C-alpha cells in the first residue's frame, strides 16, 4: 500500500488541499489504487507550531512517503522573522532533502478558456508545452551567498550560480525522455529547446555544451535547439506553440514557468511535479499562497486537483486515473463553471463559483 503525505501549508493552501483530497479519495476508491493519506505541517503554520518551517517530523514522514502533495507556503505574516525560519525556506529544504531535482510544469490551454488568456486566441489555441526546470542547483542553492559589509561601510549582496556536468546531464535526460514520450503520444517529432545565457554566463556556457554532447551521444532522435533566456521570454508571448519541451536551470525556469502560466489564462490552472531520480515526487500548484484571498472561498483549486493527476501519472503510473481527473476538469469547464480568476465576464453562459463549489463539481464527475 502506497502512502501520500499531504501538506496544506499557508494562505489558500488548506482550501485547495481539501478539494484535492476529496478528488484523490474518489479516484482512489474508483480505481482501487490502495493509497493511504497522511497529513503534516510545512511553512508558516509549521513555524507557528514548532518554530521551524520544515519540522523534522514532516521531513521524516516525507522521506517515508511515496509522494507528497503540497498546497502553498508563505505570507506577509512571517516576512519579519529570521530569514532561515521563513516559510519559503521549508519549501527549498524539502526539495533539496528529498533530491527533487526535476520540476515539471505543463502549460496546457483548455479550449474552454481561450478567452481567459490575455493573448490572442490564434496565438495560443492548442497550446501544450512542458517546462523542465532544474530545481536543486543553480543560484538558489549556490555558495557562497549572503550580505556583507565592505570596508567603506557599504553593504553588498552576493549569490553564486553553479552547475556541474552531472547535474546538467541529469536534468537533460529527463527533458529528452519526456520529449520522446510526448512525441510518441502525439505522433510528432520530438524536440527540446534548452534555455541559457551562454553569451554572458560561463555556467550556462557549460550548460549548453553539456546539452549538446548529451543529445549527440544518447538522444540523436530528439531535435535540440538553444535560446537565450531573454529571447525565450519574448518568444513565449510571440509564438508559444513553437515549443514542446523547454529545459533550463533553476532561476530561468522559475521565471519562464510563471510567464507560461499566464498563457493559459490563470496560474490557478497550472500543476507541477518535482521528481527525484527514482520517480518519487512532490506535487503542487504553480501558484503561491495568495494570503489576500485566503478564507474567502474564491481560490481556484484546479491546479492542485491537476497536480493529483500528475502524481498518479508520474509516480504511481496510473494513467487511467490521471486521465479521469483531467477529463472531469474539462467537463466542469464545459459546464461553464469558473472561479473568478478564469471568468470572462464578456462570455455568455458562464457561472462564477467558489473554491468549494468548483472542487465538488469535479468530484461529482468522478463519482
UniProtKB/Swiss-Prot annotation:
Cofactor: Mg(2+); Mn(2+)
Source organism (scientific name): Psychrobacter cryohalolentis (strain ATCC BAA-1226 / DSM 17306 / VKM B-2378 / K5)
Short name of one Pfam family: Iso_dh
GO biological process: L-leucine biosynthetic process
EC code(s) of this entry: 1.1.1.85
Xref: SMART domains: Iso_dh
Subunit structure of this chain's protein: Homodimer.
Keywords on record: Amino-acid biosynthesis, Branched-chain amino acid biosynthesis, Cytoplasm, Leucine biosynthesis, Magnesium, Manganese, Metal-binding, NAD, Oxidoreductase
Presence of keyword Metal-binding: yes
Positions bearing the site annotation: Important for catalysis: 140, 197
Catalyzed chemical reaction(s): (2R,3S)-3-isopropylmalate + NAD(+) = 4-methyl-2-oxopentanoate + CO2 + NADH
Root EC class: oxidoreductase
SUPFAM superfamilies given in the database record: Isocitrate/Isopropylmalate dehydrogenase-like
Protein name: 3-isopropylmalate dehydrogenase
Cofactor binding mode and count: Binds 1 Mg(2+) or Mn(2+) ion per subunit.
Annotated Mg(2+) binding sites: 230, 254, 258
Binding site residues for substrate: 95, 105, 133, 230
Example of a GO MF term: NAD binding
Keyword Protease (UniProt): no
Pathway, per record: Amino-acid biosynthesis; L-leucine biosynthesis; L-leucine from 3-methyl-2-oxobutanoate: step 3/4
InterPro entries per the UniProt record, alphabetical: IsoCit/isopropylmalate_DH_CS, IsoPropMal-DH-like_dom, Isopropylmalate_DH
Amino acid at each position: 500500500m502506497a502512502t501520500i503525505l499531504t501538506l496544506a501549508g499557508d494562505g489558500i493552501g488548506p482550501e485547495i488541499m481539501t478539494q484535492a483530497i476529496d478528488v484523490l479519495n474518489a479516484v482512489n476508491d474508483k480505481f482501487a489504487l490502495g493509497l493511504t493519506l497522511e497529513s503534516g505541517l510545512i511553512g508558516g503554520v509549521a513555524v507557528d507550531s514548532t518554530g521551524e518551517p520544515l519540522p523534522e517530523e514532516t521531513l521524516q514522514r516525507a522521506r517515508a512517503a511515496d509522494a507528497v502533495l503540497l498546497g502553498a507556503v508563505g505570507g506577509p505574516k512571517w516576512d519579519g522573522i529570521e530569514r532561515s525560519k521563513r516559510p519559503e525556506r521549508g519549501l527549498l529544504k524539502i526539495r533539496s532533502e528529498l533530491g527533487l531535482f526535476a520540476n515539471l510544469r505543463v502549460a496546457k490551454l483548455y479550449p474552454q478558456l481561450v478567452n481567459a488568456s490575455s493573448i490572442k486566441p490564434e496565438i495560443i489555441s492548442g497550446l501544450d508545452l512542458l517546462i523542465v526546470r532544474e530545481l536543486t542547483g543553480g543560484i538558489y542553492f549556490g555558495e557562497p551567498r549572503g550580505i556583507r559589509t565592505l570596508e567603506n561601510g557599504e553593504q553588498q549582496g552576493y549569490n553564486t550560480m553553479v552547475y556541474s556536468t552531472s547535474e546538467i546531464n541529469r536534468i537533460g535526460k529527463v527533458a529528452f525522455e519526456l520529449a520522446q514520450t510526448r512525441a510518441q503520444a502525439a505522433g510528432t517529432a520530438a524536440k527540446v529547446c534548452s534555455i541559457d545565457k551562454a553569451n554572458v554566463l560561463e555556467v550556462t556556457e557549460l550548460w549548453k555544451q553539456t546539452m549538446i554532447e548529451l543529445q549527440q551521444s544518447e538522444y540523436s532522435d530528439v531535435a535540440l535547439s538553444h535560446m537565450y533566456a531573454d529571447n525565450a521570454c519574448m518568444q513565449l508571448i510571440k509564438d508559444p506553440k513553437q515549443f514542446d519541451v523547454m529545459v533550463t536551470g533553476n532561476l530561468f525556469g522559475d521565471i519562464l514557468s510563471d510567464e507560461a502560466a499566464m498563457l493559459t489564462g490563470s496560474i490557478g490552472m497550472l500543476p507541477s511535479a518535482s521528481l527525484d531520480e527514482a520517480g518519487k515526487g512532490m506535487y503542487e500548484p504553480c501558484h503561491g499562497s495568495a494570503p489576500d484571498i485566503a478564507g474567502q472561498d474564491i481560490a481556484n483549486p484546479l491546479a492542485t486537483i491537476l497536480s493529483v493527476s500528475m502524481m498518479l501519472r508520474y509516480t504511481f503510473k496510473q494513467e487511467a486515473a490521471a486521465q479521469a481527473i483531467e477529463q472531469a476538469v474539462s467537463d466542469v469547464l464545459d459546464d461553464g463553471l469558473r472561479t473568478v480568476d478564469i471568468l470572462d465576464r464578456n462570455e455568455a453562459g458562464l457561472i462564477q463559483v467558489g473554491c468549494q463549489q468548483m472542487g465538488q463539481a469535479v468530484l461529482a464527475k468522478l463519482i
